Amino acid sequence: MSSSQTLVVKLGTSVLTGGSRRLDQSHIVELVRQCAKQHEKGHRIIIVTSGAIAAGREYLNYPDLPATIASKQLLAAVGQSALIQVWKQLFAIYGIHIGQMLLTRADIEDRERFLNARDTLHALLDNKIIPVINENDAVATAEIKVGDNDNLSALAAILGGADKLLLLTDIEGLYTADPRSNPDAKLIPEVFDINDELRQMAGDSVSGLGTGGMATKLQAATVAGRAGIDVVIAAGVKPDVISKVIDNEPVGTLFHGLKSPLETRKRWIFGAPVAGVIIVDNGAEKAIKEQGSSLLPKGIKEIKGDFSRGCVIRIQSLQGKDLAHGVAHYNSDALRLIAGHHSQEISQILGYEYGSVAVHRDDMIVS
């Protein structure tokens, strides 16, 4: 068995409906079987599901509604609960729990909400619960919509620290031309660089129910790839497609992620304005420099400046030496209260807890 992987599986409307106007229950059963099989092997599966509007239409027996945003949001509100019930009932067959997360762009772009969403996602995964993510279409406006579930799945992959992102659709992958209209179209098995030529090859969605086409899948592959995540575009009807991706078998089109995503992250953390300084004791200094450890509240001696959770801060020694840059897991007021205390005391002192660390080692670049 391959070592444990985190895989985001994005299921488009065309995959969930089979191109029809209703959910294809038999195909969803098969996709759940594949996900459950990998979950039982120890892999961490995150599902990004489309289909809420299609499910709402079916549930309400195809009402004749005007093509307005309000009508779509009505269908999404009704359909989302119906859709999540389908996932819940099917995974329950395998004794697997799911957890629903509804996101908007604001949850991603606001750093504090980003951290909250990330913590929730990791908590679900750590407790062997499969997250089922969708955009919150019932309330999202154009200003706060991610816009399509392809890009949402890329953001979910980054939130979840995924190894791979699988975009399941109604064609085999990226072709040199539209295979539905051009018999000479050839499948492109591997992509190392997404350039303008590739973008010109991308066609448009034809299902009518979805919001994403090949162009949005290339956008998603670009976003995830910059974070070092491999992306596969493949046909949802391909037998055992999820297992094949986990096992690195050739299927669809593989977009290779950057091999050194840490460099991108390092540039972001070092490039971000420093909002404050955390002074640490000698023990914390040694743990950070020699062991690459997270910074615990116990090792904090002083907080300089006022900053929010999610801001980039500088970590310094008692002698004023720069030790690291990192992302604060608590705001400055909270850190002042818990400084010098054991992590077990955080919830007692603050009345809430965002975890046991002040700055996580994954969010820290040692100087």
From Swiss-Prot:
User: Main localisation, per the record?
Assistant: cytoplasm
Q: What UniProt keywords are attached to this protein's entry? A: Amino-acid biosynthesis, ATP-binding, Cytoplasm, Kinase, Nucleotide-binding, Proline biosynthesis, Transferase
**Could you tell me which Gene3D superfamilies the record lists for this protein?**
Acetylglutamate kinase-like, PUA domain
Please provide, alphabetically and separated by semicolons, the GO molecular function terms listed in this UniProt record.
Answer: ATP binding; glutamate 5-kinase activity; RNA binding
What SMART domains does its record include? PUA
Where does the chain bind substrate? 50, 137, 149
**Where does it live in the cell?**
Cytoplasm
Q: Give residue ranges for domain PUA.
A: 275-353
Q: Which reaction does it catalyse?
A: L-glutamate + ATP = L-glutamyl 5-phosphate + ADP
For binding ATP, which residues are annotated in this chain's numbering?
A: 10, 169-170, 211-217
| Record bears the keyword ATP-binding | yes
Q: Please name the GO terms of the biological process aspect recorded for this protein, alphabetically.
A: L-proline biosynthetic process
Provide GO CC annotations from the record.
cytosol
Q: What is its EC number?
A: 2.7.2.11
InterPro entries xrefs: AceGlu_kinase-like_sf, Asp/Glu/Uridylate_kinase, G5K_ProB, Glu/AcGlu_kinase, Glu_5kinase, Glu_5kinase/COase_Synthase, Glutamate_5-kinase_CS, PUA
Pathway(s) where this gene product acts: Amino-acid biosynthesis; L-proline biosynthesis; L-glutamate 5-semialdehyde from L-glutamate: step 1/2
Source domain of life: Bacteria
Q: Name the HAMAP family on file.
A: ProB
Family classification? Belongs to the glutamate 5-kinase family.
So what does this one do? Catalyzes the transfer of a phosphate group to glutamate to form L-glutamate 5-phosphate.
What is this protein's record name?
Answer: Glutamate 5-kinase
- Say which species the protein is native to: Proteus mirabilis (strain HI4320)
